[in-house]
Amino acid sequence: MSIRNIGIMAHIDAGKTTTTERIIYYTGKSHKIGDVDSGNTITDWMPQEQERGITISSAAITCHWKDCQINIIDTPGHVDFTAEVERSLRVLDGGVVIFSAVDGIQAQTETVWKQSEKYEIPRLAYINKMDRLGANFFKVVGDIENKFKTIPLILQIPIGNESNFEGVVDIILNKELHFAMENGIPKLTYSPIREEFAEKVGFFKKKLIDILSQFSEEITQLFLEDKEISLDIIKSEIRRGTISRFIIPVLMGTSLKNIGIEPLIDSIVDYLPSPFEKNFSAFSLDANKKILVNPNENKKLSALVFKVQYSSVIAAHLYFVRVYSGEINSSKKIFNASNGKREKFTKIFRVFSNKNEQIDCVKTGDIGAVLGLKFSFTGDTLVEENNNVLLESVTFPEPVVLMSVEPERSSDEVRLREIFGIISKEDPTFSYYESKETGQLIISGMGELHLEIILTRIKDEFNLNVYTGKPQVSYRESAGKIVKEVFEFNNIFAGKNIDFKIGMIIKPLPRGEGNKIDFECDINPTIKSAIFRGITTAFVSGVFGYPIIDINVGIFSIVSETSKISESAFESISGFAFHSIFQKSDPIKLEPIMLLEIRTPIEHTGEIISKFNVMGGVIHSVSNIGEYDLIKSEAAFEKLFGYASILRSSTKGRGSFTMEFSYFKEKVG
């Protein structure tokens, strides 16, 4: 059976979950249609999701259409949960990007588009909410072309618009598609194209052939010879153009009213790639270089852990895996190539949102979940022994908001730490630590909503009440200048007198470069590894108590007058040395700058811009969508606490905004 691993991506409220619920219904996986407003969707199964009507965790669903197995991941649209999108995209072969026919391209749409570009994911575009006031299919298509510098391939034209939208004309099939409820069951019917649509269909059919002929010699030849271009050839070339990311097929519908779903599922099967149509990149530990590997069931196992999810029912973590070669089964001896630990699968599951069906194996190209892993995390590579490859891992954005947390009862502090450990294992953008100054437990995340959801989980899922402080900005720090020095340690460590010198040079790097450690002298590999760990650990907290970023540390000399220094001593002393030298680099504090997209009624635009300027924000652009203006801007994160209340007050509750982290900037004053 053929497989499609696809993601459903969009801005919040564009209709991701509603569309996914319809796909689940039409493929026969569910006998009722879940509704976001009613809180009974299959994919949004967490209590916090059903209560808020948003997707928080990327739910995995397996369903079938015709002769194809479709693994669907419905991803969050809120920027606070962008890590869920990132780790899902890493294992997808194709995607459906949903656009609102009214709002067009929105902030998170741009974010997920960029993320999917990074992973070179072929996509379909589905323009939803065609029945809404202000819906404009062709404007959104134009925006996709201009904003994303891609070639949209229109496969359908609308029958009616806004409240009169009733179906589509399929340009390839030359048929009208109508969608109606019959005895309470959605039913698709086909009819010949009416004369009123003939000219428009002819125009877009010619445009479709023109686009395909740009990369298809076969279609070009048939066109020049004035021969018929068969349906099979057209669909085959659309598929080829989609997989090569030369084109983006565009469909439409209104998912809430069950219009456009079956053609969308057909297009997922017809145009998006199977796992066997693309080689995957890996790092060969034997050859010490990147390689391309062909997916093959007969090869040894290589799989990626792309998500870890805690189940309070079984009090254990469930590990979601994508298999790139070989197969997962409980008899295999497994090795975690990322950390060198041996692992074992105890149970294997086919996933259906929050419900699991136990199975015997997960084969090449498929997605499943396993129990039994003890030392694995998101982004780790699982292999059979002697298959020395590392798959490309998953990278995540920096947390930008902090909050102090303490249990109502001091006796619960150990349990609270355990809960934080459980959550941080499943959510790489959540972290916690103990403040050196106050002794308080500090949690950090992607935004206020992110931390709010986690605190709700602690109360509802783990039955623990906590006190919290006000949200604070998660600053960073970096070196202000180059400093070069030899640090001398002559003291007792672990009961032994140690005389040790280490020379370091610390240089500031451009923003976004990350931290680098270079060894400019010959060092024993064991000592080198210990020093690397010591300095890396020291990056966690600098002079101001914040993580250190964007510096280069060069080790240019090591002199030891003491024999047989332990690894732990090298590790600890290297950390001391780094902190001592870093203090002399004129450290600077960095604050997060956020990108905002503010949606406001036109009559309030002037007031919104004025107040935003007073806050020290910068306006990048203002564009109009019907009765609303979209203001794209940026501001320091510390100025944005409480901005939702300011916006609601200024717009009489009609305004809204989204924001995402952009970059770190030196904080002045």
Curated annotation (Swiss-Prot):
It is found in: Cytoplasm. One of its GO terms (cellular component) is cytoplasm. GO terms for molecular function: GTP binding; GTPase activity; translation elongation factor activity. Residues 1-276 form the tr-type G domain. The keyword Protein biosynthesis applies. Keywords: Cytoplasm, Elongation factor, GTP-binding, Nucleotide-binding, Protein biosynthesis. Its main location: cytoplasm. HAMAP family: EF_G_EF_2_B. This is Elongation factor G 2. It comes from Borrelia garinii subsp. bavariensis (strain ATCC BAA-2496 / DSM 23469 / PBi) (Borreliella bavariensis). The gene is fusA2.
